[in-house]
Amino acid sequence: MSGTDRSQAAGAVPDSDPGLAAVSSAYQRFEPRAYLRNNYAPPRGDLSCPDGVGPWKLRCLAQTFATGEVSGRTLIDIGSGPTIYQLLSACAHFEDITMTDFLEVNRQELRLWLREEPGAFDWSVYSQHVCLIEGKGESWQEKECQLRARVKRILPIDVHRPQPLGAGGLAPLPADALVSAFCLEAVSPDLASFQRALDHITTLLRPGGHLLLIGALEESWYLAGEARLAVVPVREEEVREALVRTATRCGICARTPMPAHLQTGVDDVKGIFFTRAQKKVGV
């Protein structure tokens, strides 16, 4: 990972597709705590490093939400994995947030943090950093309290299904915005599956709503404990093309390389991308 939440939404899906079946099987060995140690503890979790991917991701999100152009009432985080950092800036702008993941072990990790239970991963360094870059005078405790209050549900998801959240109607749809960090490329065996997964999640978004994607560039594998998980390597232009095909306008696309000192042997990621896209109206 590159700070990459790829545990997120590994679908079991269609049994007739051996590639997707292999992805689902591999993710049964996913270890959330190993993943968090690899990517959110130092050195990658050292947010004081100016060229680190952690500060870059948080800055992209904070600057996007600071524009006021990405807002509404409902937001769905697609494939949350065991992480919450991707919502620290979003929670000031959306009062109803749904977190999702394919794996129960990741959903349990999220519940530990939301309930402030013993043994929960400590995200306070990330919360402090977001408060610093937002510059609103908010304490990190207030930031975390707001996020906990605004996450209304944690649901199973399978991005390889045409209805990723199923037909139960447990989340208010369509959502005003979607966030997805290090999910689609990590659970898709090839670019065609990546495109279909993007098409599927976009059905959850209202026309005119925004989709924020963070992901890994040119990565083929990463480690999460005993699990060595395959990733479909994507380039920035392929992400752009996929967004165009799924009837969204890609307004912002940025990238940053993975610094050499953060190439720690837990993946082969080359860089990180951030995109902001808007679903077209009337298509």
From Swiss-Prot:
Record: residues binding octopamine:
E219, D267
- What this protein is called in its record is Phenylethanolamine N-methyltransferase
The pH response of activity is noted as:
Optimum pH is 7.9.
Q: In which tissues is it expressed?
A: Expressed in the adrenal medulla.
InterPro entries annotated for this entry?
Answer: NNMT/PNMT/TEMT_CS, NNMT_TEMT_trans, SAM-dep_methyltransferase, SAM-dependent_MTases_sf
Q: Does the keyword Glycoprotein apply?
A: no
Mind listing the UniProt keywords for this protein, alphabetically? Catecholamine biosynthesis, Methyltransferase, Phosphoprotein, S-adenosyl-L-methionine, Transferase
The entry's S-adenosyl-L-methionine-binding residues are Y35, Y40, G79, S80, Y85, D101, N106, D158, V159, A181
Under catalytic activity, the entry for this protein gives: phenylethanolamine + S-adenosyl-L-methionine = N-methylphenylethanolamine + S-adenosyl-L-homocysteine + H(+); (R)-noradrenaline + S-adenosyl-L-methionine = (R)-adrenaline + S-adenosyl-L-homocysteine + H(+); (R)-normetanephrine + S-adenosyl-L-methionine = (R)-metanephrine + S-adenosyl-L-homocysteine + H(+); (R)-octopamine + S-adenosyl-L-methionine = (R)-synephrine + S-adenosyl-L-homocysteine + H(+)
Q: Which species is the source of this protein?
A: Bos taurus
PTM section of the record: The N-terminus is blocked.
In short, the EC number is 2.1.1.28
PROSITE patterns, per this entry?
NNMT_PNMT_TEMT, SAM_MT_NNMT_PNMT_TEMT
Give one GO molecular function term. Answer: phenylethanolamine N-methyltransferase activity
Biological pathway: Catecholamine biosynthesis; (R)-adrenaline biosynthesis; (R)-adrenaline from (R)-noradrenaline: step 1/1
Family membership: Belongs to the class I-like SAM-binding methyltransferase superfamily. NNMT/PNMT/TEMT family.
Which portions of this protein are annotated as coiled-coil regions? none
- Where does it sit, as one GO cellular component term? cytosol
Database matches in Gene3D superfamilies:
Vaccinia Virus protein VP39
Q: What does its activity-regulation comment describe? A: Inhibited by p-hydroxymercuribenzoate and p-chloromercuriphenylsulfonate.
One GO term under biological process is:
epinephrine biosynthetic process
Purpose of the protein? Catalyzes the transmethylation of nonepinephrine (noradrenaline) to form epinephrine (adrenaline), using S-adenosyl-L-methionine as the methyl donor. Other substrates include phenylethanolamine and octopamine. Also methylates normetanephrine.
Q: Which residues cross the membrane?
A: none
Give residue numbers for the modification (Phosphoserine).
Answer: S7
According to its UniProt record, this protein's enzyme class is: transferase
On whether Cytoplasm is a keyword of this UniProt record, the answer is no
